[in-house]
Regions:
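A short, well-ordered alpha-helix in the C-terminal region of glycosyltransferases
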Residues: 153-167
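Nucleotide-activated donor-binding/catalytic signature segment of Leloir-type glycosyltransferases, i.e.
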Residues: 55-73
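Aromatic "clamp/platform" in nucleotide-sugar-dependent glycosyltransferases that forms part
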Residues: 94
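Short hydrophobic beta-strand element within catalytic cores of glycosyltransferases
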Residues: 111-115
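A conserved mid-protein helix/loop that constitutes part of the nucleotide-sugar donor-binding site
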Residues: 11-34, 42, 49-55
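Conserved acidic donor-binding segment of nucleotide-sugar-dependent glycosyltransferases
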Residues: 126-127, 131-137, 146-151
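C-terminal alpha-helical cap of glycosyltransferases
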Residues: 169-180
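Short alpha-helical donor nucleotide-sugar binding micro-motif in glycosyltransferases
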Residues: 72, 80-86
Length: 180
């Protein structure tokens, strides 16, 4: 955290992926606007066609001081620092079916927040190895605020995520061979 300029008591949200509207990144920004009276830091890692519009939206919502756009990171170690520094990994995409980024976050004890019913959310059990929230902006914002104030629970769920979501490549290859 120190290397990234993050104070020890800052609550940190993270998104890693393409900055495209299909990833539901607007939903993240709009939820953050609803909780901007609660201290947090948000890091968007990646790039994409919506990056500039996302930055404009963040400025428009008055979130410039707590939201940082990191850009594309090609060094695995640099990306790992952000995963390790984050308290929660925000992944409200309804578009993805098996995002590796959720497993990468879990490997570093960072639980994901996903939308109930999203295909990718099938790997999570709410409050056990991640957090599932209805596809409703107010519900999403309220849950984020609640989790900011309960870092012990977030940490506990992150530990469980690292045990239940992370899979070895041997397991993945075995499952693919079994299915196909």
């Amino acid at each position: 955290r120190k290397a990234l300029g993050i104070a020890p008591d800052d609550f940190v949200f993270l998104f890693v992926g393409q900055h495209i509207w299909q990833k539901n990144v607007r939903f993240i920004i709009e939820a953050l606007e609803k909780i901007k009276d609660t201290p947090f830091r948000m890091f968007f890692v990646g790039n994409g066609y919506a990056a500039e519009a996302m930055k404009e939206l963040v400025a428009e919502k008055g979130l410039d001081k707590c939201v940082t756009f990191v850009g594309t990171l090609t060094e695995r170690e640099a990306i790992t620092q952000y995963y390790a520094a984050a308290d929660l990994f925000l992944f409200p995409s309804l578009y993805d079916n098996a995002p590796l980024v959720v497993r990468e976050a879990a490997a570093l004890h960072t639980p994901a927040v996903m939308i109930e019913g999203a295909t990718a959310a099938s790997i999570l059990t709410d409050n056990e190895n991640g957090f599932l929230i209805p596809n409703d902006l107010d519900a999403f914002a309220n849950r984020l605020r609640e989790l900011i104030h309960d870092p012990e629970r977030v940490h506990k769920v992150g530990i469980q995520a690292s045990h239940s979501i992370v899979r070895s490549w041997e397991d993945v290859v075995g499952e693919v061979l079994e299915r196909y």
